[in-house]
Amino acid sequence: MTEPSSRRSGYARLLDRAIRILAMRDHSEQELRRKLAAPVMSKNGPEALDVTPEELEQVVAWCIENRYLDDHRFVGQFIASRSRKGYGPARIRQELSQKGIARQDVEQAMRECDIDWVSLAREQAQRKYGEPLPSAFTEKVKVQRFLLYRGYLMEDIQEIWRNFAD
């Protein structure tokens, strides 16, 4: 008789934990699954929860059904957030794939977002290297390497100097 009540309390604890995680920020479905399956930190150190795969599936399904968990919304917010921090489309795509988002969902969200990647790349280069962007070859290579590291595409980087009067 104690078995059903302990299962229910396990489900309730897992659901409570999921809601607390999602209250902080949006997560992808894969991120939420990973965090729910991970041990909980307590005063005595990491404490493993007795979570069954069925309970985990029920909690994730409940979160999706009640719109606490939405990968499409997460992708849009993630793209906006990372682009505001100065990252380019290649890096954002790579980070989203690490978070378990399907490639077609990422590509659709990238098409839907209204971001001018060339002007963002120019802003990042000007912030790092100053107002007239360098025109010497060695300095251009440094700027290019920096922007590639930040995740901008080569054609966006080349567009900066194409429209730049020396």
From Swiss-Prot:
It is found in: Cytoplasm. It comes from the Bacteria. The keyword Zinc-finger does not apply. Pfam families: RecX_HTH1, RecX_HTH2, RecX_HTH3. Keywords: Cytoplasm. The keyword Cytoplasm applies. One of its GO terms (cellular component) is cytoplasm. Its main location: cytoplasm. One of its GO terms (biological process) is regulation of DNA repair. Modulates RecA activity. Belongs to the RecX family. PANTHER family: REGULATORY PROTEIN RECX FAMILY PROTEIN. This is Regulatory protein RecX. It comes from Klebsiella pneumoniae (strain 342). The gene is recX.
